[in-house]
C-alpha cells in the first residue's frame, strides 16, 4: 500500500489503518487501478460461533479470543494500524498463560517472508542487533509508508520473545512474517495465505493472524473484489480452502482521521452500540451473529476504512449505499467506543 493524494483520480483506496507522522494522524491506503461498482460479492458462509454475549476489557477479550481456538484453527485479529489499543490487546493475548498451551504460531503483516531467519533468531532469544531486527519490517512491501515504524510492532515481537524465554524449547511460539519481501514475487495476500497453509493448517496447527482489518472482511462489493485480482481477502481465501476453520475479528469505533477533503455520506452513530451493550467497559468484544450488531450498516460503521477516488465527485466509501451489514463482514468485532 502507499500514501496517495485525495486528488488522485481513477483509483480506489484500500484503508488498512492509521499511523501518526510528526503528530499528524494519517490514513494508510492502497491504490487500485480498476473500476468500482455497488454490486455485492457472494458471502462465504460464516461458521456458527459460541461466544459470551459480551467480553469486556482487554483481559476479558483476550480470554475469549484464546477460547475461540477450541472452535477454530485460525483467529484472524484485525487491527487499525498504529493504534495502541490493538497493540495492548494482542500482547495481552500472547502473554496469557493459556495461549502458548494451545497455539504455537503467529503470522503478522509487519514481517517479511525473506527475513524469517532473522525473526526466528530474535523470537528464540538470540542476540540480534536493532539494525538487524528492523530489517524484518523494513523489507516488507509497506515499509515505504512508514507504518511499521511505530514502536508497537517491535514491542509485540519483544513480548513474544519474553513469553518464549519462560517456555521449554519444544513449547515455544514461532512468529512468521507474512508479507512478501524482496525476491518474493507473490502478492501480499497470496503470500500470507501460503504461510498460514504451509506452516499451520497443513501441519494441523493453530495460529493467531494479525493484519489490517480490511484483509479479514468476509464480504466486499463485487467489482471492488474484481479490481484486486487474486487478493480477495485473507479470511475469504482461507474460508474457501479450509471452510469453517477461521474466526475473523474486526475493530469498530475510535477516531478515524480521513484524508483531507474526504467526508462520509453517513457518520457513525455509536450511540446505537452503547444503547445495545450491557457493559459500559470499553473495549468490548461482541459476536456479529448477535442482534442488533449483526444488522448494523457496514457503510455507517466501517465505511471510512476503504475509499474510492474513481471518477468525479471526490473520494467516497466503497460501501456507499451498500446494503452490507456488519454481520456479513466478520464473526465478531471489538468495539472501542465512540470516535471522540
Feature locations, PLM:
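N-terminal secretory signal peptides that target proteins for export/translocation
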Residues: 1-11
Amino acid at each position: 500500500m502507499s500514501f496517495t493524494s485525495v486528488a488522485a483520480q481513477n483509483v480506489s483506496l484500500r484503508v488498512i489503518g492509521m499511523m501518526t507522522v510528526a503528530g499528524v494522524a494519517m490514513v494508510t491506503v492502497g491504490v487500485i487501478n480498476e473500476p468500482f461498482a455497488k454490486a455485492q460479492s457472494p458471502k462465504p458462509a460464516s461458521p456458527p460461533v459460541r461466544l459470551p454475549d459480551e467480553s469486556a476489557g482487554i483481559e476479558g477479550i483476550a480470554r475469549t479470543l484464546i477460547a475461540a481456538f477450541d472452535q477454530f484453527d485460525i483467529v484472524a485479529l484485525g487491527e487499525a494500524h498504529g493504534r495502541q489499543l490493538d497493540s495492548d490487546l494482542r500482547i495481552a493475548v500472547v502473554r496469557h498463560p493459556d495461549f502458548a498451551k494451545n497455539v504455537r504460531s503467529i503470522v503478522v503483516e509487519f514481517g517479511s517472508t525473506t527475513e524469517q531467519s532473522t525473526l526466528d533468531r530474535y523470537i528464540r532469544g538470540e542476540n540480534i542487533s536493532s539494525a538487524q531486527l528492523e530489517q524484518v519490517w523494513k523489507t516488507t512491501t509497506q515499509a515505504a509508508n512508514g507504518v511499521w515504524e511505530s514502536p508497537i510492532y517491535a514491542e509485540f515481537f519483544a513480548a513474544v520473545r519474553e513469553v518464549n524465554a519462560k517456555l521449554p524449547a519444544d513449547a515455544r511460539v514461532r512468529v512468521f512474517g507474512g508479507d512478501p519481501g524482496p525476491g518474493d514475487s507473490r502478492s501480499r495476500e497470496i503470500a500470507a495465505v501460503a504461510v498460514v497453509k504451509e506452516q499451520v493448517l497443513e501441519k494441523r496447527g493453530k495460529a493467531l493472524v494479525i493484519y489490517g482489518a480490511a484483509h479479514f472482511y468476509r464480504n466486499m462489493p463485487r467489482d471492488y473484489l474484481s479490481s484486486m485480482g487474486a487478493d480477495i481477502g485473507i479470511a475469504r481465501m482461507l474460508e474457501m480452502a479450509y471452510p469453517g476453520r477461521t474466526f475473523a475479528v474486526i475493530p469498530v469505533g475510535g477516531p478515524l482521521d480521513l484524508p483531507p477533503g474526504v467526508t462520509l455520506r453517513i457518520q457513525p452513530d455509536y450511540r446505537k452500540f452503547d444503547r445495545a451493550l450491557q457493559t459500559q467497559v470499553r473495549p468490548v468484544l461482541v459476536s456479529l451473529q448477535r442482534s442488533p450488531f449483526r444488522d448494523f450498516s457496514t457503510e455507517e460503521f466501517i465505511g471510512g476504512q476503504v475509499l474510492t477516488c474513481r471518477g468525479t465527485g471526490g473520494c467516497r466509501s466503497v460501501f456507499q449505499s451498500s446494503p452490507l451489514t456488519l454481520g456479513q463482514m466478520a464473526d465478531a468485532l471489538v468495539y472501542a467506543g465512540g470516535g471522540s
